[in-house]
Amino acid sequence: MQCAHYSAGHCHSCQWLEKPYSQQLEDKQQNLKQLLPQAIVKQWLPPIASQQDAFRNKAKMVVSGSVERPLLGMLHRDGTAVDLCHCPLYPAHFQPVFDVVKSFIACAGLTPYNVARKRGELKYLLLTESRHSGEMMLRFVLRSETKIAQLERALPRLHEQLPQLTVISANIQPIHMAILEGEKEILFTEQKAFKEQFNGIPLYIRPHSFFQTNPKMASELYATAGRWVRELKISSMWDLFCGVGGFGLHCADKNTCLTGIEISSEAIDCARDSAKTLGLENIEFQALDSTHFAVAKDQIPQLVLVNPPRRGIGKVLCDYLSKMVPDYILYSSCNAQTMAKDIAALANYRVEKTQLFDMFPHTEHYEVLTLLVLNHN
């Protein structure tokens, strides 16, 4: 992938950009093998490659510059701004959207937040696209509600120019820290969510919902999880840290008893909408802490699927699973190091198979899916 920002030394977020892509995959696979001792892994499946450019469905842009000439991109530690509207990780059709939004910022008088002076209102722009429908969600992250009225007054013109923006909101983040978003969300559109679809499974995305930024890889990951689970012929499962339900909905059929647990109530609303659309009546989704939910139960399903944040599932949940011994654990991780630590704590299990998904090309990061099977002896 060619990148003018990288070549000019303005952005080195893609640390491995100069490394041939085949070598990137090889190095990631080698890293995974070093973390999981080969003696306990029955089957190493080949890594799944990504598109090398234009693969992202989401842009997280720091807003800087002036209200008349805003910049969308990133800030270096010294305060230098870099406009990344032409970043090759984004699809080409994002660029005209950025151009219109820049004009809108000027029209609405949304003064970019100045970190050094702690002045201004507009901190970030978050743009997300459904590859299924082409719909987009645009979120303005503001320091306060001061500019809400004038932002809302200017929106009809933005809708006219960009009808694909079906969900528009403002997020209020008043803290002077590098925190992407706050708790309060103000919706300007009747539509609260847009629909993505992977492998025939509808997934609904709302402003606060976490969603993978590489849809092709997410689709492959979910499909693989579904295929592995169907081969096991199980009838009951938990989907812990379930987000909007992508894993569980790919694994369950009408006869599967599935409980999905996620701390975000907004994500759970999305998961419930998907289950309703699919007509899955034996599924329930609850907005709870996944670990607290699990350890309070004295019975466990045949399979427990976990997709934790980078910190892993942790000692408490590992101890519980070791005690309750479900037949299978399906572990999806964005941090193989913490996954390996958790697997080491699950001494009653062997690794049946593992597969790497290159969710983050040109970086050292990747996603990995691992099936653990209980050693009955």
From Swiss-Prot:
EC numbers on record: 2.1.1.189
Top-level enzyme category: transferase
GO BP term (any one): rRNA base methylation
Superkingdom, natural source: Bacteria
Binding site for S-adenosyl-L-methionine: 212, 241, 262, 307
Chain residues that bind [4Fe-4S] cluster: 3, 11, 14, 87
Stated family: Belongs to the class I-like SAM-binding methyltransferase superfamily. RNA M5U methyltransferase family. RlmC subfamily.
Function: Catalyzes the formation of 5-methyl-uridine at position 747 (m5U747) in 23S rRNA.
Protein name in UniProt: 23S rRNA (uracil(747)-C(5))-methyltransferase RlmC
